Amino acid sequence: MNTELKILMAGVDEVGRGPLAGAVVTAAVILKKPIDGLTDSKKLSPKQRNLLAIRIKEEALAFAYGRAEVEEIDQLNIHHATLLAMRRAVEALPIQPDNVLVDGAFTPQLNMPCKAIVQGDSLIPEISAASILAKVLRDEEMVALDKIYPGYGFAEHKGYATPVHKEALMRLGPCKIHRRSYSPVADLISK
């Protein structure tokens, strides 16, 4: 009889702190075993991310998403909204982890041990997996929002402050999914 207890570790990461538009999306992942190719989602091509996301969903012991909407970002600020989204992802896991590792320098308030790891998305497979799932989901959402709010180019820049996005903001004004607390959105509204 195997008396070894496996400690369940969840990795958590976020996508979407910097954009001018859209939600901040988080994921929490508990892996059964390592998955080849896991790394920070920003180091992967969209095709690589999509293929790995499929494998993660198939092979992970558990995964869940969390989010903070634009209104929450504007009310709380991006730091607190991100921590809220991270907590939501962990609480949505169908299996409670024994401990949680979070990419970055801060951790959400949880009922289990939690540690922040700077550059954890490149170092810890569970955080890498969370990074990939969050990135794929948020990118898909921004492509869908591009159809609802045409003219801003969300499918291309995913809400980040590119020259194309800033020009569209000047021309069209902000839409419902723009973060009013972010410059240049706030600057445009105050004019």
UniProtKB/Swiss-Prot annotation:
Catalytic activity, as annotated: Endonucleolytic cleavage to 5'-phosphomonoester
Location relative to the cell: Cytoplasm
Binding site for a divalent metal cation: D13, E14, D103
Limits of the RNase H type-2 domain: 7-191
One GO location term (cellular component): ribonuclease H2 complex
EC number: 3.1.26.4
PROSITE patterns: RNASE_H_2
Family in the record: Belongs to the RNase HII family.
Protein name: Ribonuclease HII
Biological source species: Legionella pneumophila (strain Lens)
Upper taxonomic lineage: Bacteria, Pseudomonadati, Pseudomonadota, Gammaproteobacteria, Legionellales
